[in-house]
Amino acid sequence: MKKVCFSFVIMVIALIAAGCGAEDTGTSEDGEGLKIVTSFSILGDVLENIAGERSSVTYIVPIGEEPHEYEPVPSDFQAVSDADVFYVNGLGLEEWLQRLVENTSDVDVVEVSPTIDALPLEESDGLDPHAWLDVKNVMKYVEVIRDDLVERDPDGAEIYVANAEAYLQDLQELEEWIHDQVTTIPEEQRTIVISENAYRYFGEAYGFDTVGIWELNSHEEGTPGQISRVVDIVKELDLPAVFVETTVNKSFMTTVSNDSGVDIAGEVYTDAVGLEGSGAETYIDMMKHNVDTFVSGLSQ
């Protein structure tokens, strides 16, 4: 009797754990596809566009949390153990990755960024992981993912190839739209000031300078010296606006705004898509939201 009760308790704990952590964004209707896990919501959306209904997609880091220093929960380890493949951004984004995969059963880990011309960090060793903020880089992600899925699941190849082609067309249209929108901002005002200096890929692609209080969210954040430096830059450039991210403590940029006398023009999505109802639930929609926010704030 004690053995039965103990087993029941374990089952209940497992069911509770399954309800936390990894987020399921879709399911395979025919059960013949792959069980895909990825690290964060932006990649989750990209993968859903390619996998369609052929394969299920789950992401680890919940929307609203930043992926650099995420702490995996028990259900994340189980999700990765159960997966056919685990797609990650790479470039040092998932600092918790080794800890996760070392404590799960064997799973193929695939970085989606091997064809990216990665930018080196400016203040420390390593690479800037935020390559997805340049749409052309996400198009490279799509090609890597498509080819890997076709190899893993040949029976679904036609679906993956067709979905990838349609999504690449959508991304190309987004790329052209961004370039058109940017032209409305005076060149001397094309500087993005934000907490984490994550928009360097965006800046190089679309003609912006970028300034951050700190370089990466996992580094030392928001020291008085860092804030003072950014305030001086905002004043010197006579910028009309600064910005905050949805996944970062806003108090630091509030201090910059107060000390410089420059308004915070709005929130942008950097490390995650938006929650349902935000209008930024997909990668494409979040990029459109960000560009609209930059244009509105910097065109004053």
Curated annotation (Swiss-Prot):
Keyword rRNA-binding: no
Compartment(s) of residence: Cell membrane
Residues annotated to bind Mn(2+): 68, 130, 196, 271
Signal peptide span: 1-19
InterPro entries: AdhesinB, Bact_metal-bind_prot9, Lipoprotein_PsaA-like, ZnuA-like
GO BP: any one term: cell adhesion
Single GO term (MF): metal ion binding
Database matches in Pfam families: ZnuA
PROSITE patterns linked to this entry: PROKAR_LIPOPROTEIN
Main location: membrane
Lipidated residues (S-diacylglycerol cysteine): 20
GO cellular component, one term: plasma membrane
Lipid bilayer topology: Lipid-anchor
Signal listed as a keyword: yes
Keywords from the UniProt entry: Cell membrane, Lipoprotein, Manganese, Membrane, Metal-binding, Palmitate, Signal, Transport
N-palmitoyl cysteine: lipidated positions: 20
Function of the protein: Probably part of ATP-binding cassette (ABC) transport system MntABCD involved in manganese import. Binds manganese and delivers it to the membrane permease for translocation into the cytoplasm.
Similarity field: Belongs to the bacterial solute-binding protein 9 family.
Name of the protein in its database record: Manganese-binding lipoprotein MntA
Gene source species: Halalkalibacterium halodurans (strain ATCC BAA-125 / DSM 18197 / FERM 7344 / JCM 9153 / C-125) (Bacillus halodurans)
